[in-house]
């Protein structure tokens, strides 16, 4: 974001131009910033180690006091521009995956702990009410070493504020350090909740049981070329984990919003397996629509089970979401990707047939408008439409416009005036359907 430079005599120059453009836009969209304080401005860095195509510097600061001054000025600027009430609703996360030494942090574990403490105290010195935390830890450390335990012990013993704990999780097995397997193992779907529960136990043991837990990176794969990211599989994947972690975490942040992404070079295909909810051309993937359908749920939970959830809103309207999650098969889970190709991406899943649900409602009073939103390989999956188009590598304007129109759930409506109503839902593998019953006046 080019926030820091220096004059010839070493006097700091702070520049918030790009920060303001970004935060102004986010706030205009109703989005609350979750601020990650990384990576290191090059003129503050102790060394020249970098990561990713855009060369983010992973070094600790050469002078901690200069970094702290930058942080204080940044916080003051945010408070002055947006007001204390607004900024108090944000979160400030210190660094990204410092447990991955030599990858995202070019210092020692002890250096990160001290860096975290100094950074948090710099923030709190300006406005104590601001929410600070971290360490945005990778999930491998959760299973393979005591990094999280030692971090929390340090915070407790040194009386360093930890307002929230953050970590990242993906499906790949976090290999032990002594293992040198080439193949990557995919864990079962229960692995996400098991990881959360394991971390919660560690937090309780360290006397941080009441601290908010945030997953600030989450997706199916940590690999930004995993071809499954574009497929219909991702819609029930998102819904399954949103439901399975309900109440266990404060926030679940999908990584990432778009395939316009500068950690690696840009592939030629419009569907190359990028992390994003939206591809580089602005086409919305099934994962995007999964979040959109979740957003339509009400605030009162009525029922939840294997493949379904029902909610209600204050006016008596109801919402029922059904999903058919199918996991990858044992061969793919073991690391064999030989059945996966750019145009053939569904032979790597367990063989499951359609799944049937039945929704029966009684004692309905008044009139309801029932709207169904169907999303599956034949209805609204833009990747599958691209395959049926012939999988062109470079999309013309006409082709792109066509795919935009074919992306998204198929919608049907009907009016319900009877006191009893029954609906059968038949979902193919990876299929999703939302039924909303809106009270009519």
Please give the residue ranges for each predicted region.
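Aromatic/acidic polysaccharide-binding cleft in carbohydrate-active enzymes
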Residues: 215, 219-342, 376
């Amino acid at each position: 974001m080019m926030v820091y430079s220096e004059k010839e005599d070493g006097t700091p120059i702070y520049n918030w131009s790009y920060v303001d453009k970004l935060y102004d836009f986010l706030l205009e969209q109703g989005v609350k910033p979750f601020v990650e304080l990384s990576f290191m401005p090059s003129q503050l860095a102790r060394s020249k180690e970098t990561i990713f195509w855009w060369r983010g510097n992973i070094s600790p600061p050469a002078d901690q006091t200069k970094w702290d001054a930058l942080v204080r000025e940044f916080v003051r600027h945010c408070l002055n521009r947006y007001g204390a009430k607004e900024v108090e609703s944000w979160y400030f996360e210190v660094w990204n995956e410092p447990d991955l030494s030599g990858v995202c942090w070019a210092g020692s574990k002890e250096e990160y702990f001290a860096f975290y403490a100094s950074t948090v105290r710099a923030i709190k010195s300006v406005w104590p009410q601001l929410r600070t935390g971290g360490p945005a830890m990778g999930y491998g450390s959760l299973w393979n070493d005591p990094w999280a335990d030692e971090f929390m012990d340090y915070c407790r013993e040194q009386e360093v504020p930890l307002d929230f704990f953050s970590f990242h999780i993906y499906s790949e097995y976090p290999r032990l350090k002594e293992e040198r397997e080439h193949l990557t193992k995919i864990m079962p779907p229960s692995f996400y909740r098991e990881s959360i529960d394991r971390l919660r136990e560690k937090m309780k043991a360290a006397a941080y049981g009441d601290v908010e837990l945030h997953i600030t990176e989450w997706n199916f794969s940590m690999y930004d070329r995993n071809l499954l990211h574009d497929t219909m599989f991702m819609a029930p994947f998102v819904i399954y984990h949103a439901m399975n972690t309900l109440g266990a975490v404060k926030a679940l942040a999908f990584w990432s919003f778009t395939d316009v992404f500068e950690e690696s070079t840009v592939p030629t295909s419009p569907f190359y397996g990028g992390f994003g909810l939206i591809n580089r051309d602005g086409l919305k993937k099934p994962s995007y629509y999964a979040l959109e359908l979740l957003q339509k749920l009400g605030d009162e939970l009525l029922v939840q089970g294997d493949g379904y959830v029902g909610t209600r809103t204050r006016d008596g309207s109801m919402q029922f979401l059904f999903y058919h999650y199918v996991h990858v098969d044992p061969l793919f889970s073991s690391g064999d990707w030989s059945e996966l190709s750019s145009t053939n991406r569904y032979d790597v899943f367990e063989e499951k047939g359609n799944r049937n649900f039945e929704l029966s409602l009684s004692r309905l009073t008044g009139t309801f408008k029932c709207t169904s939103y169907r999303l599956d390989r034949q209805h609204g999956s833009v990747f599958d439409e691209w395959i049926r188009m012939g999988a062109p590598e470079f999309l013309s304007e006409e082709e792109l416009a066509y795919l935009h129109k074919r992306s998204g759930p198929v919608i049907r409506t009907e009016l319900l005036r009877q006191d009893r109503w029954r609906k059968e839902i038949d979902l193919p593998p990876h299929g999703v359907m939302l039924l909303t019953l809106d009270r009519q006046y």
